[in-house]
Structures are given as C-alpha cells and as structure tokens.
Amino acid sequence: MAKSLSITPVSGLSRLPWRAYLEMTKPKVVTLMLLTVLVGMCLALPGAVPLQPLIAGMLGIAMMAGAAAAMNHLIDRRIDGLMARTYNRPLPKGKVPVSHAATFAALLALLGFACLYWLVNPLTAWLTLASLLGYAVVYTAYLKRATPQNIVIGGLAGAMPPLLGWTAVTNDFHGHGLLLVIIIFAWTPPHFWALAIHRKADYAKVDIPMLPVTHGVAFTKTCIFLYTILLALACLLPVLVGMSGALYLLGSTLLSIGFIYKAWQLKYHETPGMAMDVFRFSIYHLMLLFILLLVDHYI
C-alpha cells in the first residue's frame, strides 16, 4: 500500500527576515534620492534618456545607497538602541545578526559598484563609491560624533545623487549637475536640524553633538531660518544659468516662500510639534522642487 505523502511547504523564505533587511536600506530615503538621480539624468540630455544607463544607473545607485544605509545601521546600532526614534530598528532588536548585516551591506555595495562600473561608466561608479564612503564612514562613523557641524560638512555626500544621475548618462562632470548638488547641500541642514530639535533629548542622551544640544534650540532655529533663505537663493541657480524656465521659477519661488515661512513660524511662533512640521515640509519641498525641474525640462 502506497504511503500517503504529506507535502510540507518550504518555509525558508517565509522565515527569512527580508523586511528587516529592506528596512536597513532605508527605502523611503532611497526613493526620494532616486527621484533626484532621475532628474539629474533627464536634465543632462535634451531628449529621452537611453534605456541602459537609465535602468542600470538607477539600480546601481539604489543598491549602493541601500548599502550605505545598512552601514549606517551597523555603525549606529549601539546608540540606535538607546534612542526613542530608532530603538526598534532591526539590529538593536536582534532581528538581524551583526555579521549578516555586514555581509548584506558589503554584497549590496559590491553589486551596485559592479553594475555601475560595467553597465554605466567608471566615473559614476567611483563617484557613487565616494558618496557611500562619505556618508557611511566620514559622516556616520566620525563627523556625527565629532562636531555640531556634522550635517553641514557631511551633507555633501547626501547631496551627490543628481550629479550621479548626470554622469550616468553623459560620462561627464558638468557644472549644471553641480548646481543640483548645491541645492540639496543647502537643503540638508534645515531639514535635519528641525528633526534634531524634536529629538534633542535623544541626541543628548547618546552624546551626539547635534546643534540643538551644543548651541541650544533658539540658536538652531535661527540657523534653520537663515539656511532656508540660502536655499531659496540656491534654488534660483538653474534659472540663472538657463537650465530651467518660468514654470520652475514660479514653483520654486512658492516652495521657498513656504519653507521660509515655516522656519519663521518655528523661530517666532512655535507651537507643539512645529519642528516636525518643518521637517515634513522640507521633504515635500525637495520632492516637489525636483518634480518641477523635471516637468519644466520637458515642456
């Protein structure tokens, strides 16, 4: 008599903590970053972006950005476990072993670099690697713990994506691509300082010298306000060099006025939760600004 066979589903994949690995890549941050990469690609060319550098460039940059984020999780795992905003991350919670996280980050970086080097161009591969090291090593491992100007200095690494998109389709280091870097570079401090105000106690507890901890909240609010003005000026650069036109000028001006107004409210008429309102507005500001650059380019 034939033995009845019981089919047991293969549950290996279901046990794999893929969500934890995905979380370590900071997918929301990478998605916004990829928008700026795409805009850099599109603005670099008068017509359509060729398919190979578009797909391979986006994929390679995304993998290396995810690797940088995973390295950030690795380096910050001790302080993450002590902070209310980050204590539930995969490494502090033990969802992913440290050795597995390190292997994951290294493989992701290697695959991303290979994709860019062989399928896009070496210039983009090396620039992306420099950005990864700038964020994961220079900023996360050193600057973050060394100076209240950590965000200002380290912000350059996070501002590089549109230039990476530009070089991916042109294999050329162009000044117009650098203008997009300047915009994100000026945007980064008010974005992160608003969050730092909201999470001041957390940063103080783990001895991270964020500006509100070292110089006080009032001084930080002033810096945020001044940087929004600087950002508004930086946002005019694409128009001044003829890279963008009237639609972008109108839209970016309205966004700049909105950001400056939010920063003014934070400084002079703060209400509970205002710092996080500024933080959230800054995300929409950057997203809409780059969408405007894209739309203006094609009309």
From Swiss-Prot:
InterPro entries: Protohaem_IX_farnesylTrfase, UbiA_prenyltransferase, UbiA_prenylTrfase_CS, UbiA_sf
Primary enzyme class: transferase
Residue ranges of the TM segments: 29-49, 51-71, 100-120, 123-143, 150-170, 177-197, 223-243, 244-264, 275-295
Organism: Shewanella amazonensis (strain ATCC BAA-1098 / SB2B)
Cellular location(s): Cell inner membrane
Membrane topology: Multi-pass membrane protein
This protein's name: Protoheme IX farnesyltransferase
Function noted in UniProt: Converts heme B (protoheme IX) to heme O by substitution of the vinyl group on carbon 2 of heme B porphyrin ring with a hydroxyethyl farnesyl side group.
UniProt record, GO biological process: heme O biosynthetic process
Family: Belongs to the UbiA prenyltransferase family. Protoheme IX farnesyltransferase subfamily.
UniProt GO MF annotations: protoheme IX farnesyltransferase activity
Keywords tagged on the record: Cell inner membrane, Cell membrane, Heme biosynthesis, Membrane, Transferase, Transmembrane, Transmembrane helix
Gene3D superfamilies membership: UbiA prenyltransferase
Remarks, miscellaneous: Carbon 2 of the heme B porphyrin ring is defined according to the Fischer nomenclature.
Annotated coiled-coil segments of the chain: none
Broad class of the protein's primary localization: membrane
Gene from which this protein is expressed: cyoE
Pathway: Porphyrin-containing compound metabolism; heme O biosynthesis; heme O from protoheme: step 1/1
Documented EC number(s): 2.5.1.141
GO CC, one annotated term: plasma membrane
Catalytic activity annotation: heme b + (2E,6E)-farnesyl diphosphate + H2O = Fe(II)-heme o + diphosphate
